[in-house]
Amino acid sequence: MAGFTMSLNLLLLVAMVATNILSLYHLSSTTNFFQSTVKSSQSSVPTVPDHLLRQLHTIRAAINHLTTHQPDKSTSTSTSRAAVSSSSSSTAPKELLIYSKLSPIASACHNYPDLLHEYMNYTPFSLCPSDTDLVEKLILRGCHPLPRRRCFSRTPRNPSDSKPESNVLWSYYSCKSFDCLITKFSDLGFDLSLEKSKSQFSAYKSELDLPISQLLQIAKSANSVLRLGIDVGGGTGSFAAAMKARNVTVLTTTMNFNAPYSEAVAMRGLVPLHVPLQQRLPVFDGVVDLVRCGRAVNRWIPVTVMEFFFFDLDRILRGGGYLWLDRFFSKKVDLENVYAPMIGKLGYKKVKWAVANKADSKHGEVFLTALLQKPVAR
């Protein structure tokens, strides 16, 4: 098809060039004829030679014929898209087709049709497939919120408050108990004791630390009340648990990366928000007093994505609210040239700004702890 189109275009080009040459020849002949006869007769009108008329007529007819058979690009493209759409619709699961008529589906979902079709390929009114990994893949790729399904989510068989492990479906994860997670990944916060959470945010060991007591005192001195907060990438909800003991409600955004983070947050009587960092936070404008960004917010996030992220945090923060960057990790040169200017665009007051070198740094990596206050009014 591509070769035929190229040959057709070449033939059209040759025909057009030939037409132009004959036209120039005709004009030249006509001009000479006028110059030779102008003295003898001012009113005589030259006639076009018959052979030129026949050649021009033949070429124009050929051009019209070729143009008529030349496929229109816009029509061809739309037809192709319609064919693809039709093909996709014919292979899409029935439940996906039904839901798509009821509610819009995130545009990013259509970029991963295989994953989306696998997710929506289930038996209605029965148990949902065991597809936690698939859910995480779709959400991380921007397919959020996911389409709703008419199936029953799987739950543990014998949940018990006295046995935390019984409240988790461990088949999705490499570890099969909280003890395993605590032993293998001691820094991930799966020791769910309140004492552990309190001690984690009460000690002051370096300039990078910001104990909760100091945070509350700063807010009190500024006549600012802390009632509602969000911990972005808050893991198992340790910060939210410590703030709950201070009568401050904190929502925790988290993803289940090979561990039951959301379940751990919920078992503490806290609210887990299962949302990715690249998506708009499901919170109304200007209602949050505090946003904390933990280990999940670091240099691995693309710069433009991070800029949109910071301005989304600004959207939900009330005037006078606080943004706490807790150990933001990057190279020192990037902090100075990229991230500090980006943060500066928010126009926040620097209540605390502490930078320290990473202990085992080999490439100039540093940590930043910053407490920033949003202007009361814009």
From Swiss-Prot:
Pfam annotation, one family: Methyltransf_29
Residues annotated as glycosylated: N247
Membrane topology (UniProt): Single-pass type II membrane protein
Keyword Transmembrane: yes
One Gene Ontology cellular component annotation held by this UniProt entry: Golgi apparatus
A Gene Ontology BP annotation from the UniProt entry: methylation
Record flagged with keyword Transmembrane helix: yes
UniProt-annotated location(s): Golgi apparatus membrane
Annotated transmembrane regions: 7-29
Entry GO MF terms: methyltransferase activity
Start and end residues of each stretch annotated as Disordered: 67-87
Keywords associated with the record: Glycoprotein, Golgi apparatus, Membrane, Methyltransferase, Signal-anchor, Transferase, Transmembrane, Transmembrane helix
Cytoplasmic side: 1-6
Enzyme Commission designation: 2.1.1.-
The organism's place on the tree of life at top rank: Eukaryota
Residue intervals on the Lumenal side: 30-378
Low complexity bias locations: 74-87
Family that this chain belongs to: Belongs to the methyltransferase superfamily.
Stated name of the protein: Probable methyltransferase At1g29790
Species name: Arabidopsis thaliana
Lineage of origin: Eukaryota, Viridiplantae, Streptophyta, Embryophyta, Tracheophyta
Gene designation per UniProt: CLSC5
